[in-house]
């Protein structure tokens, strides 16, 4: 399906099958992003089945967490987006079983795209990963 043909998600809370945030997706992460100031934020405790190397959260799971919270940062600005490009820099291993904090903010809004930045830190504030994404604006949605 082409991005321009994607159906709108007018009420994101009614979409419950998303791998990142869907509460009715038993295989997903079931993230619960919330708005705090001009950022989207979320906490997550990775379980053993989220690991790559023993005791370390798999990089794909970290990508998914950052991607999801960055999309919510755009959504909280009233923009329904899909990720066009994303870059992640891993700084430290994210430990399984510990609370992780994901945050993201919109850095720039353009005509067709949004630039978003995200980061993952542990409880001590140690930077574990940081990301930048270009997201394609599908359509404006109701502000949350």
Regions found by a protein language model. Name each.
Residues 34-39, 57-81:
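Active-site helix/loop of acyl-thioester processing domains in fatty-acid/polyketide metabolism
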Residues 44-46, 90, 137:
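Hydrophobic residues in beta-strands and at strand termini
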Residues 46-60:
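Short histidine-centered catalytic/ligand-binding loop motif
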């Amino acid at each position: 399906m082409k991005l321009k043909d994607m159906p709108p998600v007018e009420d994101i809370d009614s979409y419950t099958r998303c791998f990142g945030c869907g509460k009715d997706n038993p295989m997903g992460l079931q993230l619960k992003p919330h708005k705090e100031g001009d950022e989207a934020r979320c906490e997550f405790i990775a379980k053993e089945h989220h690991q790559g190397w023993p005791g370390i959260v798999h990089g794909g799971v970290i990508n998914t967490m950052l991607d999801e919270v960055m999309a919510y940062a755009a959504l909280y600005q009233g923009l329904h987006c899909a990720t066009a490009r994303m870059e992640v820099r891993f700084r430290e291993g994210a430990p399984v079983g510990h609370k992780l904090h994901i945050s993201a903010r919109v850095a720039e809004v353009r005509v067709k795209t949004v630039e978003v930045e995200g980061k993952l830190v542990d409880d001590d504030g140690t930077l574990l990963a940081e990301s930048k994404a270009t997201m394609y604006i599908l359509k404006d949605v109701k502000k949350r």
